[in-house]
Amino acid sequence: MYSKVKSLGISGMEAFAVTVECDISSGLPRFDVVGLPDTVVKESRERVRSTIKNCKLEFPLSRITVNIAPADIKKEGALYDLPVLIAILKSSGQIKENVDDYAFIGELALDGEIRSARGILPMIMSAKEQGLNKVFVPEENAYEGSVVDGVEVYPASHIKDVLLHIKNEKPIKAVKYNFDEEVKYEYNIDFSDVKGQDQAKRALEIAAAGGHNCLLIGPPGSGKSMLAKRLPTILPDMTFEEKLETSKVYSIAGKIPKGKSLVSKRPFRSPHHTVSAQALTGGGANPKPGEISLAHNGVMFMDEFPEFDRRAKESLRQPLEDGVVTVSRTAGTFTYPSSIMLVAAMNPCPCGYFGHPSKPCTCSDAAKKRYKDKVSGPLLDRIDIHVEVSPVEYDELSNNSESEKSRDIKKRVDKAREIQRKRFEGTDITCNAKMTPKITKECCVLSEEADNLLHESFDSFAMSARAYDKILRLARTIADLAESKEIKLEHIAEALQFRTLDRKYWDE
């Protein structure tokens, strides 16, 4: 007897419709799974067989063929256990009710318990697009899936619960997402914790206001990491669309905590400098998002930047420029979102004390050159703001007066972002850092004095076209913070000062 059951699958960042077909025919007992399954999917035969036996159901002693379509897409993971079991029960006549209105997702334990699966959110979003409005998911993932309006998400903890619902003996109540329960995330760190470092704080305020990448250069203990960790506290609150995008990435990576639905705060990722290029960009045998994508709509902090593997550093080029990372593997080509703010931190030399007012540098010129050469020119070009973080003076540390709080800086950032939102209304651009060269030219109107200064600087600093555009975007953000429609002399001057450190450290 033939039956088919609906399910869903994940390939890269996208979900797709899956049909699990089952045919039970006469012949020697045999259980085959076809349809380009991976090893885990093939192993579902034993999980399904044991579950049927342990739940006092009848396993057909016939020839069983299960096809997981479409056959041209590789199926990965154990999430097909539940639909395979339902298809077998349907084919063997143990389920007589119509299940065409339902889709089934979930891994089975041998006792019939339904375990969590990754990628539930994008799969439910895909179900809605395909007109599927009833989906059984593991209980642990139900709240995550309930975010999608228009789809009834049924939490299932055991196969018996699913069967009782199908037979209408004990209906399961669909989970409803309560938007009123969303709470604003409160940070337990604040910019006021950082003593001194006014220039670095100003640089991070500009970075937050325009979505710019930033490089912090300074000796050990100057507060680079402390500053970077506080950057999310002044970033604008995430919109619902941003929460959905970010949660989709985290869902596919299997990083949404049990009982949670949306990622409500801006991600902050801080990979160790020994991380591989693949761990940064994503991919692998079973492709998953990497650190860059896990920082989507948030901040990725790379401390000890020169110490990262060169391939790992250079793999940042495309994501920083395009906002996406494309990974090509044998299984196919996958594109992951990576709209991030990069904050990189480094010492000025291997010992860390080049230019220090009191501690002498012990590095040779050759050692300093080798250290700085670990960061390539094209990568530096993609970082908008270069700021020197000087050692904190005793007077600043001992000063008991309270520094400006994150909430006050955030108000200015929010105001600048609102100006940008209105400016880019009707486009895909979200902030000044994402402006195309054409839009940069249209939106960056310079006063005569500002234009003259930029012209002189372009010639004397031998700027690239990319660096020129980045200075304009940076000046546009500074002008937005000052609520000025025109980019004035002081805005260009401040933007230029954040682009001169590469001359000091790399061209000396």
Locations of regions flagged by a protein language model:
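Peripheral, non-AAA+ core regions of ATP-driven protein-machinery
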Residues: 1-215, 219-225, 468, 485-508
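Short beta-strand elements
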Residues: 18-24, 280, 384-387
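Basic, amphipathic alpha-helical bundle interface domains used for macromolecular binding and assembly
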Residues: 40-45, 60, 67-77, 286-287, ...
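Residues immediately C-terminal
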Residues: 110, 300-301, 307-308
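Walker A/P-loop
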Residues: 216-257
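The Walker A (P-loop) glycine that initiates the GxxxxGKT/S ATP-binding motif of P-loop NTPases
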Residues: 218, 282, 304
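Walker B catalytic acidic pair
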Residues: 297, 303-304, 315
